[in-house]
Regions:
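Catalytic core of membrane glycerolipid acyltransferases/transacylases, capturing the structured
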Residues: 16, 30-88
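Membrane-anchoring hydrophobic helices of lipid-metabolizing enzymes
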Residues: 1-35, 44-45, 73, 78-80, ...
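Generic preference for hydrophobic
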Residues: 22, 36, 60-61, 81, ...
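Short, charge-rich binding segments
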Residues: 27, 51, 86, 98-103
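Residue-level recognition of alpha-helix initiation/capping sites
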Residues: 3-4, 44, 67, 91-92, ...
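Residue-level "edge-of-site" marker
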Residues: 26, 89, 143
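A generic structural signal for well-ordered alpha-helical segments
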Residues: 13, 53, 76, 100, ...
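Non-catalytic C-terminal accessory region of glycerolipid acyltransferases
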Residues: 92-200
Length: 200
């Protein structure tokens, strides 16, 4: 069903001219599990990342509200997403992605929410999972169409992958150090991507 969902999304985004132009694909690890931590502005970035990585499947951490939206809920569920309750995160927030990584799967985390505090928590979550699972993190940035309205206006999307890294720091101190590193990478990639977007 992932294949069907990915192809449905691909056709829609392509027809509307919103399928992302991708940079830095050489930075993606060729095999094994890893985390892809991508900037987040709306739900179109989730769809574009899934399409860009296809046929490799990503298991997305997605806020549970997305699963409750008509149509989009079906797509998100069948793009291997698993729900996360940001208000009451339980141990499964760490356990599920850690297990997927150990199985060699790719986990997608969108660590910049609408509020900066929310973004920091999710960045630290990505770093914690990478630290415990001893998995690589690939930072990524998305700029462009954010929602159905943008897609209907034929808004374009742009995606860039940065260089992967391991969380080599230990304990809380290591997590804080690498959370800052991830924040820096995401800002730098967003700036780099904005330079590459053709001026209208």
């Amino acid at each position: 069903v992932y294949k069907l969902a990915a192809n449905v999304v691909k056709v829609i985004l392509k027809l509307m001219g919103s399928k992302a132009r991708v940079y830095g694909e050489e930075n993606l690890p060729k095999e094994g599990g890893f985390i892809i931590a991508c900037t987040h502005t709306g739900y179109v970035d989730i769809l574009n990342l899934g399409v860009a990585m296809y046929p490799r499947e990503i298991h997305f951490m997605a806020k549970k509200q997305l699963f409750e939206m008509k149509g989009l809920g079906w797509l998100v569920k069948h793009l291997n997403a698993f729900p996360v309750d940001r208000d009451n995160p339980g141990p499964s927030v760490i356990k599920i992605p850690s297990q997927l990584l150990k199985e060699g799967k790719i986990v997608g985390i969108f660590p910049s929410g609408t509020r900066s505090a929310d973004g920091t928590d999710l960045k630290q979550g990505a770093i914690t999972i990478a630290q415990l699972a001893k998995a690589q993190i690939v930072p990524a940035a998305y700029v462009g169409a954010r929602n159905a309205g943008d897609v209907m206006k034929r808004g374009k999307g742009y995606l860039i992958y940065g260089e992967p890294f391991y969380v080599t720091g230990k304990g809380k101190e290591g997590r804080e150090q690498f959370t800052q590193h991830l924040e820096h990478e995401l800002v730098a990639l967003t700036e780099e991507l904005q330079k590459r977007i053709p001026v209208k």
